[in-house]
Amino acid sequence: DFVIFTGDLTHTTDDPKERRKRMTEFRDIAAQLKVKTVRFIPGEHDASLDNGKAFKEFFGAPNYTFDHKGVHFIVLDNVSDPGAQLGEVQLAWLADDLKKQAQDARIVVFAHRPLFDLYPQWDWATRDGAKAIELLMPHTNVTVFYGHIHQEHHQMTGHIAHHSAKSLIFPLPVAGSQPKRSPLPWDPA
């Protein structure tokens, strides 16, 4: 029905012209997918250097909601702010949206960084993510998907399930398994 990319659509560059070139290339590649709808979330490589300006030009609002087949989807932007946070404005927006949802509504949240403190030393957290989780807690059927860590991970915060999947490229080590976060060597197997 749809595909959603959970961020890091491009690799970081300080050159605004190069950033736009890379986003154009990614948008053109994604447009070739044989699916009706493609949705995007910014990753820090797409948004942190210009507070999400180029991302918005190419892909639209970095946070939004949509409903599909009885599920309410919420897309959060926890990368455009260089402080790795959602911010008070977005948290108020989330609170307003959640007020419209029944307590037992099926809710799926997408974000780039994990909303909980997975490993803050490697920037694997959202500084005010606990506030978002607190807003989600009254709802009994919530699942969160995130990118950023480039590996499969599953975590529960109360009754809220959080999941990430492996990246197709740029594999990262398990949190804390080495002193510095750096890509793992390529394994041709």
PLM features per residue range, with description:
Residues 119-131:
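A contiguous binding-surface segment within folded domains or other stable secondary-structure elements
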Residues 15-106, 128-143, 155-188:
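Extended active-site neighborhood of metal-dependent phosphoesterases/phosphodiesterases
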Residues 1-20, 118:
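N-terminal active-site segment of His-dependent metallophosphoesterases
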Residues 80-81, 113-117, 149-152:
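Short, catalytically relevant binding-site loops at active-site mouths
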Residues 7-8, 43-44, 112, 147-148:
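Active-site glycine-centered loops adjacent to acidic/histidine catalytic or metal-binding residues
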Residues 101-118:
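Short acidic, glycine-rich surface-loop motifs adjacent to enzyme active sites
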Residues 3-5, 40, 109, 145:
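Residue-level marker for buried hydrophobic side chains located in beta-strands
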Residues 10-11, 46, 115, 151:
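Short active-site segment of divalent metal-dependent hydrolases/proteases
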